[in-house]
């Protein structure tokens, strides 16, 4: 299913800034839903990508990227934010509000997948879910907990992508189609897609 929102009807109408301010994309969502693949895609699109940056440092990074003399790469930032704890996401939501109040142009991408798909991916990769602390939570319990942590952030997303039935290549293609030319356009449309991620 595809839903398209015009500029006046976007779920998040973030303000435009001066030409020296960077274009910022926040990549977040469920662990195992494709955040790393998304980060590599934005690297290919010429973004300077940062993984696991503490929310309290996001505005500092944006300020540095806004300084005169920055090259083109420094004008485009993609920041990956993953599961930590409830306080982490509370800080991230607060930082997004600060960014909007400061007039920073940014978009939030939330990547998701069905619980059964996420469980299968973790079992196939033999990796431990980041919220399976000392194996006190099963994978299913960790995923359920992560959903509760990310619920508010998901509601703030400009783009929601369900990767349950999508291959890594398909995810890359969709992100390129959505962001390769539109990120720098003023008055752009925001398109929300629901897809999937076939093999993790």
Please tell me what each predicted stretch does.
Residues 27:
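Hydrophobic anchor at the beta1->P-loop junction of P-loop NTPases
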Residues 1-23, 57-67:
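Extreme N-terminal, non-catalytic leader segments
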Residues 30:
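P-loop (Walker A) phosphate-binding loop of NTP-binding proteins
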């Amino acid at each position: 299913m595809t839903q398209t929102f015009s500029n006046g009807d976007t779920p998040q109408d973030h303000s435009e800034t001066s030409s020296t301010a960077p274009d910022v994309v926040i990549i977040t969502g469920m662990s195992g839903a494709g955040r790393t693949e998304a980060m590599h895609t934005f690297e290919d699109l010429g973004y300077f990508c940062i993984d696991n940056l503490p929310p309290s440092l996001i505005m500092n990074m944006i300020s540095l990227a806004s300084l005169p003399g920055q090259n083109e790469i420094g004008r485009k930032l993609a920041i990956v934010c993953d599961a930590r704890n409830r306080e982490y996401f509370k800080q991230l939501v607060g930082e997004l509000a600060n960014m909007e109040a400061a007039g920073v142009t940014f978009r939030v991408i939330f990547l998701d997948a069905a619980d059964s798909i996420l469980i299968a991916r973790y079992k196939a990769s033999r990796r431990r879910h980041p919220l399976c602390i000392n194996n006190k939570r099963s994978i299913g319990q960790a995923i359920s907990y992560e959903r509760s942590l990310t619920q508010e952030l998901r509601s703030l997303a400009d783009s929601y992508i369900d990767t349950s039935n999508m291959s890594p290549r398909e995810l890359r293609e969709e992100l390129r189609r959505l962001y390769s030319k539109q990120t720098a356009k003023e008055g752009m449309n925001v398109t929300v897609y629901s897809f999937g991620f076939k093999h993790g």
